[in-house]
């Protein structure tokens, strides 16, 4: 009896130990389940926000333009969120730096895709945007391009991308109209060999020849070049009435200075990539009287005064050339999501195709090729260190 009782007591002790261990395990599992439930609720709340990617050059020579694009898009998103967001959801922006470099653009684009963005806006340099079209197209992500406008983008579009800026052929038409108005019969065309500037140079040369003009010289330089003396010599000896520079402001300003220093008296016309205060600073007095084919900037838009003032107040700097259009695109993507009545990307793409959006820069309607229906380019001239309408 005594031996049996002792064994029984030992068995009871083991059971108690097992029960304690079991309760501890159960408590841990309950704690984990509670934590996972909380995480799931947090994830669901985060998922309710609509993530919009902004891709722009945040570093490099064109970082100022990229910063303007990001700032203006965020201003538009803030305004939408202040009114309750879209379909009850807030928009959360996330920015990727493409540095206007094709390789970095691919990295930036892949990053946005991996983050699960609903849509993407931005794109300043055509050469950087071009290799990302397949990435966004394969992922089925709506992409509204703000600045880049090479016709090569139209050919590579998989149907999900939309060009909110007028295309290169529209700019070429505006350029030829200006050449004819100013009586230029022979022009020299200079580009940097990238997708944007080479496309604009080619389209303009073809359009000018079709209009009866002559291409006196066609030169290609390298981005970052400092000495344009060889190009200047060729331009002067060609007998050109005017020079059309189709690349960006850094090279355009140096070429302008060196042309004037060499005694070139003809006209100088710049593509839209030169609409920057930095061009005027670098070119100095040599820039006086130079023409620019400008996108719709805040200084040229009668209804943009409030936006211009708020931008300056918010960021402590003047709104750049593409700030108005960037702000419009921020509003446009919110409008498309609202009309799609969901964050479904196919529905958003269809909503973008049917856009009739009125923004600061004018009306945004797309053709069946997802390009802007009407040209937004206008010639301006440098006077007193500023770009002014004629």
Model-derived regions, located:
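Segments of small-molecule ligand-sensing domains
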Residues: 313-323, 334-389
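Extracellular/periplasmic bilobed ligand-binding domains
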Residues: 201-293
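An alpha-beta-alpha
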Residues: 58, 160-223, 242, 333
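Periplasmic-binding protein-like
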Residues: 112-124, 144-146, 188-191, 239-249, ...
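Extracellular/periplasmic periplasmic-binding protein-like sensory domains
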Residues: 256-327, 382, 386-389
């Amino acid at each position: 009896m005594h031996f049996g009782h002792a064994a029984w007591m030992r068995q009871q002790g083991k059971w108690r130990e097992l029960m304690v261990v079991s309760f501890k395990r159960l408590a841990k599992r309950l704690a984990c389940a509670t934590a996972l439930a909380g995480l799931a609720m947090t994830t669901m709340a985060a998922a309710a926000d609509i993530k919009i990617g902004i891709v722009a050059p945040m570093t490099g020579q064109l970082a100022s333009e990229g910063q303007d694009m990001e700032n203006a898009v965020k201003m538009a998103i803030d305004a939408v969120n202040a009114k309750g967001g879209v379909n009850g959801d807030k928009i959360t922006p996330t920015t990727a730096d493409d540095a206007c470099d094709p390789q970095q653009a691919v990295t930036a684009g892949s990053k946005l895709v991996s983050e699960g963005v609903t849509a993407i806006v931005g794109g300043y340099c055509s050469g950087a945007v071009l290799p990302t079209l397949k990435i966004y197209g394969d992922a089925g992500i709506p992409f509204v391009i703000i600045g880049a406008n090479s016709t090569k983008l139209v050919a590579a579009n998989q149907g999900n991308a939309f060009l909110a800026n007028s295309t290169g052929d529209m700019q070429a038409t505006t350029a030829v109209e200006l050449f004819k108005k100013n009586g230029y019969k022979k022009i020299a065309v200079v580009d940097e060999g990238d997708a944007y500037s080479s496309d604009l140079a080619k389209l303009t040369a073809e359009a000018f020849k079709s209009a009866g003009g002559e291409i006196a010289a066609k030169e290609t330089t390298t981005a970052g070049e400092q000495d344009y003396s060889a190009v200047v010599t060729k331009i002067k000896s060609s007998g050109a009435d005017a020079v059309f520079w189709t690349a960006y402001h850094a090279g355009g300003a140096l070429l302008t200075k060196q042309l004037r220093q060499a005694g070139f008296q003809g006209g100088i016309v710049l593509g839209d990539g030169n609409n920057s205060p930095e061009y005027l600073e670098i070119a100095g007095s040599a820039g006086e009287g130079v023409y620019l084919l400008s996108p719709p900037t805040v200084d040229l838009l009668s209804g943009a005064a409030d936006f211009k003032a708020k931008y300056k107040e918010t960021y402590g700097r003047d709104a750049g050339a593409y700030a108005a259009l960037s702000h419009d695109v921020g509003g446009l993507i919110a409008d498309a999501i609202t009309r799609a009545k969901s964050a479904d990307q196919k529905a958003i793409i269809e909503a973008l195709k049917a856009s009739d959006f009125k923004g600061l820069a004018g009306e945004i309607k797309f053709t069946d090729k997802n390009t802007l229906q009407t040209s937004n380019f206008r010639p301006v001239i440098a006077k007193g260190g500023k770009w002014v309408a004629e």
